[in-house]
């Protein structure tokens, strides 16, 4: 085993010997020197050198201890050995903690002092052994079965999924080598020639530890005679709804039947035989077409492998090349659901994927004005979009979908259209507030001006309203105030009325003349008469018109009783006139 590895051993050189008190008679026995430890997988090799004492009588013993243990433990394979090397395994120790070794020389009852090496962590100093390889030949392919380093050991027990393998294959008669990289324990190398001898070798690699093994021993194998039944090739898988569609190439005849099987992805990453781990697909058994459809529920793992076999009567082809399927790459998620938040000139769009397989994918949205057909597309690796520099108070519509371009150049369907109206911008808001302020201020100013105007009109131009006495006069029925005119000329007789509060006027008509009588508590004839022009209006209407003369006229009496406060005389056509506006002094009544 060690000769195969051929790797430089890790040499742990001991420092200056630590001399312990020797046993009786061992004063001249020196401890071993140049102690080093070489580890490959779980196999330890401890080496040292002696000082040239007679090897026939000197033996050596080794002990070890770990960081978790203060007590030194004996190495069973390294007790009282006569050689300067011993090999052993420590399967029960923790390879991730520091371990320390020491060796001493012994001769009879005498022993040397112990010579210790510096502590080290076995996991980081261990080497990987070449993987074990087993070959299986077909007519046009070779199956390579690989066992990882330290198959049943403790050193790489947790690292098996991290190993990758490099396979070098060549025809025995040629030096042209082909390199194949694999992460599986079984690798099928197709497209070989029948009845041809191929040789190959394999090495293991641990990328994170930056370690690799040596190549395994070269093995050669010959492919078989070409099979009468060709192998189905060019397997393709597509997803349609909730089903998978498996297609392959084959020059089929009417009697050729096909069957397909699937293998969970994790099964190929485990060592050992897996021929019994392939599972049949019921809807792809004994089909005559070069395709079959099966439900996604048939396969319950996220990753799996497919292969197809052809048969005709008693003849059966080899299994096709294994097709790796990642369900995340083939199953399209449903259309996403979007939410849109509107701002003044911005729309915030969040794309909510409806399936967990959307993780790590890209997203695309398209948006446009509701009144336009010009669409704008945006693509991101995240579900959040910000649409800036939009028009305020404008309706925009948005759709989104999930992209698989990095994997299979496929996309989901677009989501439902969602339309949202942007809010007023800051500039529009200022103008709206300013406009409302101007309108409000204008209304207040107009109202104030109107109030001032009404006040000025009331003060400077009071309403021309007749006195209350005239209002009361005109409030009587017209028929009672009419004075019938006759063709005869009549005279007016005036009387002086003194100290009167009430003036009663009675009008009587006679066929020959108009007779007017005045009654009062006290009356006295002044002997003064006043004639005024008589004004006649509308003889057709038959109404008498009052004539008025300024006080102090022909009557020569200042402010005579019977006048109004504004100094106006009136004709005595009234039947009754009673008003506090009449003066109590003697007045001239015409």
Curated annotation (Swiss-Prot):
N-terminal signal peptide: 1-26
SUPFAM superfamilies for this protein: Fibronectin type III
Topological domains, Extracellular: 27-429
Glycosylation sites: 43, 109, 181, 214, 314, 370, 409, 413
Pfam families: Interfer-bind (PF09294), Tissue_fac (PF01108)
UniProt cross-link Glycyl lysine isopeptide (Lys-Gly) (interchain with G-Cter in ubiquitin), position: 517
Family: Belongs to the type II cytokine receptor family.
Protein name, per record: Interferon alpha/beta receptor 1
Organism of this sequence: Mus musculus (Mouse)
Source lineage: Eukaryota, Metazoa, Chordata, Craniata, Vertebrata
